């Protein structure tokens, strides 16, 4: 097939102007248009297949076509334009359209081509053939006008189509008339039935009319009864309102009593265990006293050194058991739970059900602790995306605790819990106690100094919840998780395994307001949904392209964070894009900087390369915006 354009054809098309060429290209369906642009070279700095890249390709194609001097770019541009010309012909003429082989660029090749089309496609509108020739590569041919006359005008073609389909339409019309006639007959029968019913109704209405006075009296009595019932209803509604308010107060009281009962039940269980322990110790003391008596008797008989040493050991053991027994009786069961400090806000909190409400409340509380509005809004989106993902939002730096407190207040009503993690925990018992006894009724758990001990040891139960929430629903999908990192030689460097479970934000990089700024008050809020994923206002657009781009950048960096981490970072990125008022480039930069970098440090990955890629993407976007 020939795709060459003669010089005369190039001049003819160039005289039409760029707008006419753009209109010609836009007449092609978007699918074929995208296919044709896909054959053109990729434009640096643009994402492949993106509308902005297609627009830039079209701009460059037309620019090369209008070059006044021959060049390789000009020849490639005309060859590429011939592909648009072919797709236009396939849509406007026939899918089987193709060029005549070995036709060349002779003087009369245009008329030969048109006449050949007349043989193969006689029922094509003349206007389409003329437009096809105008944008073709053939030189102008005097005989081409005569060749155009072989095709009927669009008006004549439309008329012929109407004439050809007239018998079919007449048959359809006759069938519809027959159907309408049947319907009319049915309607007539129905009308007759209605007339009989109307006659019967008229007779009954006459009887009712004769009893008008009696009916009016009954109506007046009913009206009086309605008025009386209305007054009673108003009184009842007022009583219901009073009962509702009384019931709300009772609910709060019952909730408080239930918590105390649960706490007392746990205390009773623990007291029972201590009682068993004390009895066991008492029995052991009794046995030891008996043994001591036997030893004393033996001592009187035989004063050997072995018996003396054994006597001392038994005496020391008895003293120790007596001390332990006295101390065990004083141990309170609440010691197991006092490490989880409860913060309650049972009044003056607002229910939050949409992403906008939650983001605004978090942002306002962050501004209340000194952050600028832009920093607060950005951090609020990252925090909300983490909660929706079921992961742990983590903060490092000098402001970690105060920022974490502000966020916990924003979403933790009516109550949330703080765990100040001590140094050197070697058991996961505490975290399991929290999950089993407190987690279902708590709105948020804030781990302060989470890197002071090995999280993979003390936080096993919490990690299990985070991992499970990445795969299936749990009973704890309402629970928000926040962690802060401490600084100093006693901490685990770079957070340890915590960095796998959520983004880490360095609070020292956030912008703060001036010392003279008037700060708003912290306000408590409560999640109105049973799950973070059920909040209103999350965007539902497809994010597959963005996730593919993130995957490509991670492959470019050569970083494999593990199967679980890949799943978690993709879920977080998807949630972040779904939170309104974002920008996909800034979201991509946040994922690379706050999530990928921290985990790469733990895994010994290409930290510098990941940082360079994040800065490069942000720089390219900024350059594109400024151009």
UniProtKB/Swiss-Prot annotation:
One of its GO terms (biological process) is defense response to virus. It is found in: Cytoplasm. The keyword Cytoplasm applies. Component of antiviral defense system Druantia type I, composed of DruA, DruB, DruC, DruD and DruE. Expression of Druantia in E.coli (strain MG1655) confers resistance to phage lambda, SECphi18, SECphi27 and T4. It comes from the Bacteria. GO terms for cellular component: cytoplasm. Coiled coil: none annotated. Its main location: cytoplasm. It comes from Escherichia coli (strain UMEA 4076-1). This is Druantia protein DruC. Disruption phenotype: When this gene is missing the Druantia system does not confer resistance to SECphi27 in E.coli. Keywords: Antiviral defense, Cytoplasm.
């Amino acid at each position: 097939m020939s795709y060459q354009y003669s010089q005369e054809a190039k001049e003819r098309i160039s005289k039409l102007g760029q707008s006419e060429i753009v209109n010609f290209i836009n007449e092609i369906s978007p699918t074929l248009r995208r296919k044709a642009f896909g054959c053109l070279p990729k434009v640096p700095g643009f994402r492949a297949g993106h509308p902005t890249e297609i627009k830039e390709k079209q701009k460059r194609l037309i620019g090369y076509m209008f070059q006044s001097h021959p060049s390789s770019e000009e020849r490639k541009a005309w060859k590429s334009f011939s592909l648009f010309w072919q797709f236009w012909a396939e849509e406007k003429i026939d899918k089987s359209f193709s060029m005549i082989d070995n036709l060349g660029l002779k003087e009369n090749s245009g008329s030969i081509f048109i006449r050949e089309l007349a043989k193969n496609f006689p029922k094509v509108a003349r206007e389409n053939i003329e437009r096809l020739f105008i944008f073709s590569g053939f030189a102008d041919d005097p005989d081409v006008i005569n060749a155009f006359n072989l095709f009927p005008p669009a008006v004549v073609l439309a008329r012929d189509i109407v004439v050809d389909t007239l018998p079919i339409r007449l048959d359809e019309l006759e069938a519809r008339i027959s159907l309408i006639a049947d319907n009319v007959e049915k309607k007539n029968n129905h009308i007759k039935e209605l007339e009989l019913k109307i006659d019967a109704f008229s007779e009954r209405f006459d009887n009712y009319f004769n009893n008008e006075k009696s009916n009016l009296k009954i109506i007046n009595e009913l009206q009086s009864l309605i008025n009386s019932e209305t007054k009673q209803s108003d009184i009842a509604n007022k009583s219901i309102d009073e009962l509702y308010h009384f019931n709300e107060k009772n609910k709060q009281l019952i909730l408080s009593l239930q918590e105390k009962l649960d706490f007392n039940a746990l205390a009773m269980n623990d007291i029972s265990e201590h009682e068993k322990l004390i009895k066991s110790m008492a029995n052991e003391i009794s046995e030891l006293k008996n043994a001591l008596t036997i030893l004393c008797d033996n001592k009187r008989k035989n004063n050997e050194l072995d018996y003396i040493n054994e006597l001392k050991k038994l005496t020391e053991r008895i003293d120790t058991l007596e001390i332990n027994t006295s101390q065990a009786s004083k141990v309170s069961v609440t010691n197991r739970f006092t490490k989880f400090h409860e913060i309650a806000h049972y009044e003056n909190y607002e229910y939050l059900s949409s992403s906008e409400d939650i983001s605004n409340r978090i942002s306002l509380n962050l501004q209340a602790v000194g952050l600028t509005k832009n920093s607060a809004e950005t951090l609020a989106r990252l925090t909300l995306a983490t909660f929706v993902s079921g992961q742990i939002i983590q903060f490092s730096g000098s402001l970690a605790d105060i920022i974490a407190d502000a966020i916990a207040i924003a979403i933790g009503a009516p109550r949330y819990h703080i765990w100040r993690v001590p140094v050197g925990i070697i058991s996961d018992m505490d975290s399991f106690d929290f999950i089993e006894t407190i987690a279902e009724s708590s709105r948020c758990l804030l781990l302060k100094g989470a890197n002071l001990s090995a999280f993979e040891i003390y936080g096993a139960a919490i990690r299990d919840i985070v991992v499970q929430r990445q795969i299936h629903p749990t009973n704890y999908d309402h629970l928000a998780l926040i962690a802060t990192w401490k600084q100093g030689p006693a901490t685990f460097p770079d957070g340890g395994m915590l960095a796998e479970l959520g983004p880490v934000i360095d609070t020292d990089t956030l912008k703060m307001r001036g010392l003279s700024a008037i700060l708003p008050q912290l306000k408590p809020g409560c999640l109105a949904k049973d799950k973070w994923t059920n909040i209103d206002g999350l965007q539902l657009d497809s994010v597959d392209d963005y996730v593919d781009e993130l995957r490509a950048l991670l492959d470019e960096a050569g970083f494999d964070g593990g199967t679980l981490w890949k799943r978690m970072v993709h879920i977080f990125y998807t949630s972040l894009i779904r939170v309104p008022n974002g920008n996909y480039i800034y979201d991509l930069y946040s994922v690379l900087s706050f999530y990928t970098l921290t985990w790469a440090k733990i895994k010994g990955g290409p930290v510098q390369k990941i940082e360079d890629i994040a800065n490069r993407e942000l720089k390219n976007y900024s350059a594109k915006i400024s151009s």
